């Protein structure tokens, strides 16, 4: 079994070092964020989950310029939609710029247009809804963590740059002194530049940080017993999670059945 240390993930005894490193990382790349997007500074993606709440708190503590954005996927749990609205109202009162971006098409409309549902290997919904970036050359920051899955352990690091919109020639760096200079030098020419301050946090570190900072979290975790905050019936969720969501939100199940019937009918009409 690969240990957290081998994966470069902080264990629960590393909380102080983890938060200090995260804030240092945010401060280090603020000049880059301001040069690429002077109006907004960093653009911080907010989903309404625990990781996102930790991320915004770290940005507030760092004292840098940033804008928080939330992409309305049209498939979020209603409680999450209300929670995001509440947090944005609170942060806006503190002078933090917050933006909710609504898509041109809903999830249902996109599926009808494509005549298919998303699945694990073709998650077009993420590309068009969840991962939409309104400011192409900004420095983005997300609350992704390597400990969330084996896939993220292999892909996600503190600094990510990609040379083209199609994400070719991916450059991934850990936040250390040798990588810091290279990342700063490269970022001015790369279209895609992301800072992930909590990429190396374990779930234990995240939960200890929430307790230490007394952070408010989305009520869905306690109310529904969920482990994740995301779209209802997401193909990346486990079968167990999707079955539980189907029981909790039967109205969405009916809509999915309607969608499947409509897609099947439109395909038959084309044939």
Where are these regions (language model features)?
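Nucleotide-activated chemistry modules centered on ATP-dependent adenylation/adenylyltransferase
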Residues: 1-271
